[in-house]
Amino acid sequence: MREMSNLFKSTTNGFIGKLNLTLEQKTVIYDALKEIKKCLSDVIFKEYEIHPRYMTQGSAGYKTQNQPCHLSQEIDYDLGCYLPFSDIEETGKPYRAANVFFNTVDTALEELAIKMHWNGVCKEKDSCCRVLLTNNIHIDIPLYSVPDKEFQTIHECCDSFRKSISSAESYDIEIDEESWENFDYDEVLLAHRTEGWKNSDPRKINMFFQMQFKMKGEQLKRICRYLKAWRDFKWEEGGPTSIYLMCLAEDLFDAEDVFGDDIKLLEILRKMPERLETPVLNKAESEELKMKNSDDLRLLIEYSKLFSQDLNKAISDTTISDKTACLLIQDHLGVRFPIEESLPEKNISEKIRSIPISTVNTDMPLARVRVG
C-alpha cells in the first residue's frame, strides 16, 4: 500500500499547499478590508449616526478558502456588515428600506474602488454589495440588521474592531473582527435588493462548523477543502455548493483516521453514493439542501464512484508505478495534485477492504463533459 497522505496534506509540497492563498493574495484582501471597513464606518456614521460591526463569514470564516482552479473562478471573501435599528415597524422589519442602505454602501464603495484602482463594484448580487478587487478576487458585503438593544451586546473596542490585524501573515488567525460568541441576538435580518429585509442568520452555520472542526479535528476541515477543490476542477461553473459539500462531508465523517487523509478521503468518497440517495441537511438550520441543477446530483454520484475507484487503485495497486498512481488522482483533482516517483509504503490492506465500495453505472452516460 502506498503512503499518499502527505501528498494531500503537506502545506509545502502537497495538494493543500497548492490550495492555500499566496501571501500576495492575502495582502490584497487584507489591505482592501481595512479600506472598506474604514470607508463604510465613516459613511454610515455620517449618514445615519450608526457604528456598524463587521464579521468575516463563509469559507474565509470557516478557514476552508481555496485557490481557484480555473481562470474563470474567483477568490470570494464574505464580510458581513451589521447595523442596529431601534425603529421597528409592526411587521418586525426596520423602517428604513433596504435599498436605501444598498444605495449608500454602493455609492461609497464605487468611490473607494476608483480611489484604490480596483476593478469596480458589481450590483447584480441581490443579497450583497460586491467589490471587484482584481480579475480573480472579490469581496462580498451582505448588510444585516440587528435589533438595537441586542446589537449593544456585540462588543466594541479599538475603532469598532475587536481584533487588530497587524500584518497579512496574521490573516488566517486574526482576520475576524468579532467572535461569533459575542453576537447575542434573537433575530437578524438580511437586506435584499428586491425583497427588502429577509430573515437570515449566518451565525448558525458558522458556529456549527466551528464546533464540528473543534470536535472532529482538522482532518475534517482538510477533507472539506479537498472536496471543494475536486468540485472546482470538475465543474468550471456551477456544481454542488460549498455548503452542500461541507454538510455532506461532516455527515459522513465520524472521526479522524490515523492512517491519513488519503484513506479518510477514500472512505468519504465510497460512502457518498449511498448517502446521496437521501437528502443532505444543513443541520444548523434543520433544512434540506438542494442542487440548483438537478443533473448535478447524478454527476456528483458518478464522479464520486470514479474518484473512489481510482484513489483506491492509486493507494492499493502495487503493479503500477508511483507516478502512475499520482496521475490517476490528477484525473480528478487536476495538475495541482503533486506527482512523486518514489512513495513510502504502509500496511493497511484490511482497512481498505473494510470500506464499502460503490460501483459505477457505465450504462448511464454522463450528461456533461468533465473538466480536464
Give residue ranges: language-model regions.
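N-terminal regions immediately upstream of nucleotidyltransferase
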Residues: 1-75, 81-100, 371
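Extracellular structured ligand-interaction cores
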Residues: 74-78, 126-128, 136-140, 168-170, ...
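Extended, alpha-helix-rich binding/interface surfaces that flank or overlap catalytic cores
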Residues: 138-214, 367-372
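Conserved nucleotidyltransferase catalytic core and NTase-mimicking acidic/glycine-rich helix/loop elements
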Residues: 209-320
